[in-house]
């Protein structure tokens, strides 16, 4: 059934891009990379926000071009923001400005023009939504960039990009679909067996590094950035078991699927998957402490705090799901933070707590 569901979530079938369009995209991306290498960040940002949006608007509204012909310029727009978001420091005001740009672009739509025969209007509807209201292709492009380049880029660039994506997700752009990138990231760092850190090498750019070569220290900063910035969104999606994304993204990692929590959980976000992430953070914290990895230990502790504080403030369904679970889960030492949130007394026998829940 997954392939039928994926066909509904993916873009409609269409012809392959023309050779001319592919050549333009290749040259355009190379030009963008050269501008980034020169440090022309502000000029590039202006080109994205003003020039690219103007080209799309002018071609559709003034020239009367079909919406398919402007898609290459939309992809160009998102590629510029991808490059800027990973090169500009996530702690800078300029990085916040990139997020504001995306929200302002969303506010430009819907793009329309008078229909032929002066009867109504034509709306710029792409296979991935309406320009500019739905920010078509933004989520798909950013997901592809993360999958293709997330392993090879430096730790600084990975953190900058993850922070940008989490900020967009916290604003609920594209109807929460940006959060599918968090699923990919969390599956890699929390649901797959990774070494904590096997060497002393820095997390610099490595074009030969694949996803299978990554370790916890590569990915944990990006994951905790998501938990810090978009914690409420991730908790909300977990409460409602959100899975509005293709199955190859929503499916759990091997370690999660083999766990008791994984056997309870559907694909996508769920209360049980949220608990598993908390459990893994607690395990990582302990492993880091034992290995003397102070930075990783503190990051894991921060992640636990962000997750715990969020579901506590929401009186979340996640806490109620934990309360209703069996005693084996309640006694898991790596879920002690959930015991506290659920109001369990560590000195009280489990049988007494079970009676109290049933009464």
From Swiss-Prot:
<dbReference type="InterPro" id="IPR022085">
    <property type="entry name" value="OpdG"/>
</dbReference>
<dbReference type="Pfam" id="PF12311">
    <property type="entry name" value="DUF3632"/>
</dbReference>
<protein>
    <recommendedName>
        <fullName>Oxopyrrolidines biosynthesis cluster protein G</fullName>
    </recommendedName>
</protein>
<feature type="compositionally biased region" description="Low complexity">
    <location>
        <begin position="7"/>
        <end position="18"/>
    </location>
</feature>
<dbReference type="InterPro" id="IPR053204">
    <property type="entry name" value="Oxopyrrolidines_Biosynth-assoc"/>
</dbReference>
<feature type="region of interest" description="Disordered">
    <location>
        <begin position="1"/>
        <end position="32"/>
    </location>
</feature>
<comment type="function">
    <text>Part of the gene cluster that mediates the biosynthesis of oxopyrrolidines, polyketide-amino acid hybrid compounds with feature structures of tetramic acid. Does not seem to play a role in oxopyrrolidines A and B biosynthesis.</text>
</comment>
